[in-house]
Amino acid sequence: MKRFVTLTALVVCAASAEAAPETYVIDNSRTSSQFSYRYLGLANQTQRFEKISGTMVFDPATQSGSADVTIDATSVNTGQALLNAQMRAADFFDTANYPVITFKSGKMILSGEQSSLSGELTIKGVTRPVTLAVTHFQCMQDSSLQAETCGAQASVTVRRSDFNMGKFPFLVSNDITLNLAFKAVKAQSYMQVASRDSGR
């Protein structure tokens, strides 16, 4: 009887461990963050941020989770030094006072085309509730990294004026679309992957 109880406990523990939520660390070198807007009411322009960090928790049993993402606003890159400076200035991101953009999500729902991340987006010290549309979410063993990874694309359209960035509406559209294409590495393996990358 004692042996049966012990075996049962081991099976339950193994099942719990298998279904437990896993933490993944965003790999900046394999992640991109962009924002696009309409310039002069004509063509769309797309710019990017070079530095993104954060974590994601994913529960495969319930197909749900959460995310905590930080974008270094000072890393904005338009390909032009003058425009970079304008983007960092007080009229736009004001990186001297607000060097980071954050997104904290406590609710991730994965359901085909209805997949989403709901949470709070903070830009320039202003926090607003947003829901990001999520596509191409997949977790898998990445043979090139020798680690389990999760990746997806997420996007949301916000209004600049909601974040104290509404100046020059005749130049830049009020609507801005944020796009994030990320790859995250399981936390237990992240340092090994980062160490191999730095040694290249």
Regions inferred by a protein language model and the residue ranges of each:
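Low-complexity, acidic/polar, glycine-enriched regions of mature
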Residues: 19-200
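Hydrophobic h-region of N-terminal signal peptides that target proteins for export
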Residues: 10-18
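Sec-dependent signal peptide recognition
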Residues: 2-7
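Compositionally biased amphipathic helical and low-complexity segments enriched in hydrophobic
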Residues: 8-11, 111
